[in-house]
């Protein structure tokens, strides 16, 4: 009974095109379709669940800046899907390593978005979380930066103060 009233007062909009009725419409779903992507970046093997796109950006910002639980769930589902596809020798030794947000950003948002998502993914997959990463220096707001500027912005910004796993 309350659900139809809630939908009338607070309609769901597609994160991609803003169409009313569903969090991600079939047209925009092709830009948010969890897969298992594997690439090498500067000698580091990177596994990812989603290719970056305007739809992905909207979902990430919806979770990060607006605390939309629907966006959180889309991100968690994509990450869980990717982790479950990892080869057994890799997933057996995998850990989740959340990148910390600044105290100011966490205070402004009212939550530590990355840590909350990491906890949920850990719970669903049984992959442990390793903490100990700290912010060493202040960072610029990443939202308006290019890929090159983002890389420059985070270079040397984090430090690990935990035990290393062999």
What kind of region is each of these model predictions?
Residues 1-166:
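Glycine-rich phosphate/pyrophosphate-handling loop used in enzymes and phosphotransfer proteins
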